[in-house]
Amino acid sequence: MDDALPRHPDTTATLLLCGRFGDSREGLKPLSPSEFRDFARWLEARRIALGDLLHKDAKSIFRNYAKTAPLCERLGALLRRTDDLALARERWAGLDIWVVGQFDPGYPSRLRRRLGFAALPLLFGAGPRELLDGGGICVVGSRDSSPRGLEFSRLLGARCGREGMTVISSDMRGADREVVGAALANNGKVVCVLSDSLEKALAAKRYREPLAAGMMAFATPFSPEVNFKVANAIRANKYQYALSDIAVIVETRQTGGIWLGADENRNEGWVPALVRTDDVMPSGNLALLHLGLAPITRQDVKDCASVRDFFVQRALARGRGAADDRSAPAARPAGPHPLPPTATASFDLYAVFVAELRRFAATGPHSDAEIAAHFGLDIEQTRRWVSRAVAEGAVHATAAGVRAG
């Protein structure tokens, strides 16, 4: 498949500098994420594109950048790995694996916007890449989730599948695999973020049909053949949150990757998050409730008229609560890089609003008052967001009201 091949020169250069393929000679290591970040920023400051390294006098560029001769020689040797890259590209194409670099126009905009250089330089995957920019619900849970947690995952996945909400999770056994399977079984779409073994996942019989039907996409920031590492699993968590509109934590302890991912999302403010509550639940779930995450129960998922509307209402309600908290006088921790919580929360909630507005407008036209009632928003906030959505082309304003674009 041609789409598997890195067409953009920036991606080709990134692969040569950072990719792990071919026979690694001792002493020739691909750039680490931090090394690549520093080099990319240096190039950007001088208005040199990564792809220019394939055509211009790269040696002079390396000499200007590298502080030592060994580093200059290493950069040059990495760029000369074209034969090894050609073989790797041929292998990936045979498996329908695509790859994009951070500076490729085809790199998912949500990852670029939310993670920036916190993301790894390359993204591999398979299936329709456009699913990665379509948003959805991130669902994460423990490998050893309880029977109640697994039942909740199946129920949530089934409802998301039936109602057209993309599920963003992983192929990890337990809650993640259950929610993915239930969504696919109900004709839903899935984005599966992997921390290892993309090649093995593509060979799994359970995913062949949804991949062929365009109902599923895999994505991983790691080489397709890489084996499982705990550190990689923790690093992959942020991708699930960053690709989504809202997140649900099914089960977590107060340690481990699921906990760290939930805490990182809470600190970074990528998306609103809810945590499953029950009569009996893990200590991590209870701790997340105490930290301010919204609750979600099995009955909520089972009884709500629309799971999409339920999530929109919860996200907007938490956003209003956070805004109220921020309006009260409070001591601010000192630091060189304070977070801008207002802008972050506002953007994420607006993304949720627009996603639902498109669906609601398809049943229109609807007036601003009808939209405000549908979302439970005050009329002024509704008008601001509707005006922005119209300006961005997400919906159309007519004399009769707002219609789908």
Language model features by range: what are they?
Residues 1-35, 44-47, 53-57, 76, ...:
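Glycine-biased, small-residue-rich flexible motifs in mid-sequence functional cores and linkers
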